[in-house]
């Protein structure tokens, strides 16, 4: 009955508003340039009842320096706890594998869930150890695998399927674009397309490659979200530099997006560097550090934007640009409050230039605001002139036809100038459609 109601509502919405979802297949990577020394696979192990891919493994025969960032949700899933313990124990050194599963979050599953996550890392170590090129004391004392899970909360993993699936996945590891896509597909849940980005850069005559993939479409809010991600490079980067690069990349990408304001129990993004490209170790004081950091950040931003574009039921990609804030904190507060506002997001879906909702969000954000100095504009994606809605606190005679034209496009920018100071922040968000309600109402059915 509920499904019929939601379908009927969705039909009304599509008739009343613009109608069709934007084509998202254009965002799927068709080829790539991938780091040396990594191989991976993604398969259907049977965790998902629909037979889709649900298990992925990435392997480096060379030991990696590694770092990860995790959810701030108090109910941290078993894989989050186990991966954090692994990295703390080994000091971020000698990581060889990352195992992903989708379809079951292994969250709020007690001691049994922790044991399941530990068994998965042990199984990955046992299966790949014959292919390691070097051993250290860490290799003997600590696990060399990280684990990430996503899916329904409160259910135990089908451990027998995971273990059997890992055996099959390791038997057919590969490094071509096809294998990277398999892994990117295997971590998806409500995603409508796999998110994979890669690039190559040359620094002082050395060529390095960086790749990343991520999943996420709902329960997305800064400080990560229902979001799993992995960046890898063949550059020789020190542990401290790996940690610093990851923090910078995340703060300027995944911590600047929102789909629905919810933060998951499982958020994890890791960064591995295996040094297979050779050369001197890159530290935070190395000339190459900033170029590597900026390249990883660029990939992180591309992936973060893909997550927003794939927001559950999303029909619009919205950039929220805040300027003139008194502090960095104020700029971030205003950007995130606008991005999370259900009233703002539903207005975008309805293609309604209701700028009062934007102004309302600015006002309750908790940031320092000077109403007589505040200016709000829509910036079209086609490069034409911005449409001023409010200038120095004064409402403008808005051309509603032009406003509707801007809002009918798949992309737009909301520009807010607070007129209070020099600080700025950019976030990325999407609209709320009827399909968002349908997808989440039917999630477990």
UniProtKB/Swiss-Prot annotation:
GO CC terms of this entry: mitochondrial matrix; mitochondrion
Quaternary structure and partners: Heterodimer of an alpha and a beta chain.
Catalyzed reactions: N(2)-acetyl-L-ornithine + L-glutamate = N-acetyl-L-glutamate + L-ornithine; L-glutamate + acetyl-CoA = N-acetyl-L-glutamate + CoA + H(+)
Source organism per UniProt: Schizosaccharomyces pombe (strain 972 / ATCC 24843) (Fission yeast)
Catalytic site positions: 226
EC number: 2.3.1.35, 2.3.1.1
Family annotation (CDD domains): OAT
Record-level GO BP terms: arginine biosynthetic process via ornithine; glutamate metabolic process; L-arginine biosynthetic process; ornithine biosynthetic process
Protein name per Swiss-Prot or TrEMBL: Arginine biosynthesis bifunctional protein ArgJ, mitochondrial
Pathway(s) of this molecule: Amino-acid biosynthesis; L-arginine biosynthesis; L-ornithine and N-acetyl-L-glutamate from L-glutamate and N(2)-acetyl-L-ornithine (cyclic): step 1/1; Amino-acid biosynthesis; L-arginine biosynthesis; N(2)-acetyl-L-ornithine from L-glutamate: step 1/4
InterPro entries for this protein: Arg_biosynth_ArgJ (IPR002813), ArgJ-like_dom_sf (IPR016117), ArgJ_beta_C (IPR042195)
Binding site for substrate: 189, 215, 226, 312, 440, 445
Subcellular location(s) per record: Mitochondrion matrix
Marked site (Involved in the stabilization of negative charge on the oxyanion by the formation of the oxyanion hole) residue numbers: 150-151
Biological role stated in the UniProt entry: Catalyzes two activities which are involved in the cyclic version of arginine biosynthesis: the synthesis of acetylglutamate from glutamate and acetyl-CoA, and of ornithine by transacetylation between acetylornithine and glutamate.
Taxonomic lineage: Eukaryota, Fungi, Dikarya, Ascomycota, Taphrinomycotina
Residues the UniProt record annotates as site (Cleavage): 225-226
GO molecular-function terms, A-Z: glutamate N-acetyltransferase activity; L-glutamate N-acetyltransferase activity
HAMAP family attached to this UniProt entry: ArgJ
PTM summary: The alpha and beta chains are autoproteolytically processed from a single precursor protein within the mitochondrion.
More info: This protein may be expected to contain an N-terminal transit peptide but none has been predicted.
Keywords on record: Acyltransferase, Amino-acid biosynthesis, Arginine biosynthesis, Autocatalytic cleavage, Mitochondrion, Multifunctional enzyme, Transferase
Similarity remark: Belongs to the ArgJ family.
Keyword Lyase belongs to the record: no
SUPFAM superfamilies: DmpA/ArgJ-like (SSF56266)
